[in-house]
Amino acid sequence: MDRRILTLAGISAAALGLFMRSDRGAAESTPGKFEITKTDEEWKKQLTPEQYYVLRKHGTERAGTSPLDKIYAPGTYACAGCDLPLFSSTTKFDSRTGWPSFYAPIEKAIGTSVDKSFFTTRTEVHCRRCGGHLGHVFDDGPKPTGLRYCMNGVALKFLPEKKSS
């Protein structure tokens, strides 16, 4: 009997978490809220399945799977959905989390919202131009900001700094 109650409680908790996450995502995907708006079909044609899952469905890539986590060359990290420059490589640091991390975004490049999924409250980070989900920001980063913008690498594209001749 106790095992059955525990199983039902676990299933109920998981369903509630999915419901809360789904409700939050729908409210943020309201058409006309961002400069760049597209239908789901347009996004699916433009993005890879992994990019679509993260940017449009608020997914998370598996830790340690993004090659961008280990790139420290000079350049800019832009939104994979709309090419808006989001982070400078000068603010990137090794957070040892398995995701590209930065201590500050480029000014006016991102937006944030409250994410109450998975039984906790976090600050979700999205592209201010297309609304694509990028990751979350935490208050355990290095100086000078003390913030850690923990980004999904699949939501970003790295643009190397052009060498002057």
Where do the model's predicted regions map?
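Short coil/turn linker and secondary-structure boundary residues
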Residues: 1, 38-39, 47
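C-terminal segment of classical bacterial N-terminal signal peptides
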Residues: 18-22
